[in-house]
Amino acid sequence: YLMEVERCIELGFRGFLVWDEGVLSLLNTMKQNRDLPEDIVFKVSIFAGHANAAGFRLLESLGAASGNPVADLTLPELASIRSVVSLPLDIHIQLWSSMGGFNRIYETPEIARVASPCYFKMEPGTGLGMYMPWGMSDDMLAELGREKIRSVKNIIELIGQVHPELKVSKQGPKDLKIPVLN
């Protein structure tokens, strides 16, 4: 994994998904020692399985720039995490059949209220098979993309109706770490 990170940095990547606290600690130590660029960020995957405030406090102390809590946390559980950390939460709103399937679109105004700053995630698609080039046609993939965009539009409108005081990030906020071209 470390060799992959180093190669991706050479290609311009500035954000990395990390699944393990030990790997997070090692990468952050490398960053502090200037073995990795200062502008690199580490986001903790949902597969790390963090579901409480103590776990997120640990992630923040290890250098996480953001973290994905497990997908089915209640509003009070999300609020408890928010009460102890300042890092953005990456919260899954739509999961498809390949990951158990659920839809929390109508909860997004309240999730944003208790968990902001947060990013909402809709992934990965109709199934892991879509990542195989022979699994779905280009037209099907394009339609899936349009549906995700429609969901995002609906979420933004819903939050604006229920909690107009909340702000939605502008396109391409700096903390997303869009790759830089070298």
Residue ranges and their predicted role:
Residues Y1-F13, L17-H50, L75-N182:
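Active-site pocket-lining/capping segments in soluble small-molecule metabolic enzymes
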Residues L62-G63, V85:
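Short, structured coil segments at secondary-structure junctions
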Residues I9, E60-S61:
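Non-catalytic positions within long, well-ordered alpha-helices that form the structural scaffold/packing
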Residues V70-A71:
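Short beta->alpha connector loops at strand-helix junctions that form conserved
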Residues A51-G55:
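Short, glycine/polar-rich helix-capping loops at beta-to-alpha or helix-loop-helix junctions
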